[in-house]
Amino acid sequence: MGEQDEPRLIENLVSLRGRHVEPLGDITSVASYNGVEYQADIQRNRIWKAPTSAKRDVMINGKGYSLKSIRAAPPAIVNHTTRDKWLRVCNVVGLSIDPLDEMVSEYWKLRIDRKIGEDVLSSSNYCPFGSNPQRREYLRTLINYFLFDGTGAQDSAYPAEYILEFTDPLIPSTWRILDKRSAFDSMWPKMVFSIRSKKGMPPDYPSISATKKVLMEPWVRHIDSDYRGSLHIRTR
């Protein structure tokens, strides 16, 4: 059901064009992620599916929206990303990676001491990520980048300005608009942090270039016969 919710919502938005619909207001324009205005007779199978590199699924009144169905499986917020790519994002948003290095170091100590498992909830007393207001605000900036602006590999050519979260694509009263402050605050209580191996890590690690290895190494540990060092963030 959830996987069809996004095209159904876009189809509904097109039918509502020219009307005032809360929480969006007056809908004057509904376009694809790359700005092509949808025609009134658009069929669902003709709705443009955004590429994985795009952060927006649709443009409403010239603004980019990422669509999130509550009925679909929760998507990853940050998908198995190694330290070198987090460092790229830190450089883009103008932050030092040092606070994140500290959080990851604490995570590994807690995990090796068996106080936490691979997954740690943001609500856990042992969660080192965002364990104080300063860390949460630091993470807000980083996580917002992944939600709205790009990935560890690159800036998106199609960033989003808002998230349109919904339960039923046909009932506007179930829709909610999230911006860069409200999105993080809404997701934070449900966030799960993990450091994993199979996904995100180079398959030939540690036999990689010395330049890349030195950037990745601070997060990597050899546990259960595997090198683990990619940080994954999702909601539950």
Residue spans for each PLM region:
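Short, positively charged
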Residues: 1-56, 60, 69-236
